[in-house]
Amino acid sequence: MTRTPVNVTVTGAAGQIGYALLFRIASGHLLGPDVPVNLRLLEIPQGLKAAEGTAMELDDCAFPLLRGIEITDDPNVGFAGANVALLVGARPRTKGMERGDLLAANGGIFKPQGKAINDHAADDIKVLVVGNPANTNALIAQAAAPDVPAERFTAMTRLDHNRAISQLAAKTGAAVSDIKKLTIWGNHSATQYPDIFHAEIAGKNAAETVNDEVWLADTFIPTVAKRGAAIIEARGASSAASAANAAIDHVHTWVNGTAEGDWTSMGIPSDGSYGVPEGIISSFPVTTKDGKYEIVQGLDINEFSRTRIDASVKELTEERDAVRELGLI
């Protein structure tokens, strides 16, 4: 195995999602079974000791693909030569915190990280923002990295995509592998819109197969959108393993391509498609090939969908305007 190792940086590496993520990256699930990796664990100073413990466990797994581990609290070191960056660490919303406070707190994290990526990452860097509010955090990081092509900054809506597939499979009795062309539109928030009008179940239109708009509006959409809160209620902690799995799926699909006859959902900088204002980072249906993605064009958007897409996009533009006022973009 003579391939050059790929440098993968994970922020918030000592957290729950980081813990669920790192072992799968090291075992080849992120990039492929023949791609060696160097891991960079980027943490805040008080997380370094826990990150060292995780690194010890990674060593103890003796993963053939894992060529090296570096732990740091300096973004300039953590992103040096990075080919893939998973920005997991973020400031969670605490009780009584206003959205503006949350955006400002995360601006203090993602703006310096974006600058470090701009100054030190490899030319082929691919960035996935997992830490919430993911879409707007990605926008903040991207704005701080003017020398990096904007399309290299993405936000994770793959967890919502996977949740929607699972709920649709449960409703119809189909296997998850039979479900194709599902779409998440908009923000990774309670306003997101999981769209089944173009989805297929074993080759048949999903909306026609379900044929139940009341279930769609009153059960399916809210269940997918509020699944994270339901998991916190049940588990006493936020979803970590499923979020890590979605991050793996997102990057793996971005690098290795979507299957023929299918697409995925990614939060990406809008080019104005489907009436989404240019520049905001919104989820779209995309196909990927050779490490690049393209928005699926020509989909007919009905009134049911249009209203919901517009509501989520409105929230994204409000978040963009808020971080602009804060001087973060």
Curated annotation (Swiss-Prot):
Keywords: NAD, Oxidoreductase, Tricarboxylic acid cycle. CDD domains: MDH_chloroplast-like. Gene3D superfamilies: Lactate dehydrogenase/glycoside hydrolase, family 4, C-terminal, NAD(P)-binding Rossmann-like Domain. The active site is at residue 188. It catalyses: (S)-malate + NAD(+) = oxaloacetate + NADH + H(+). Pfam families: Ldh_1_C, Ldh_1_N. SUPFAM superfamilies: LDH C-terminal domain-like, NAD(P)-binding Rossmann-fold domains. GO terms for biological process: malate metabolic process; tricarboxylic acid cycle. Substrate binds at residues 93, 99, 132, 163. PANTHER family: MALATE DEHYDROGENASE. HAMAP family: Malate_dehydrog_2. Catalyzes the reversible oxidation of malate to oxaloacetate. This is Malate dehydrogenase.
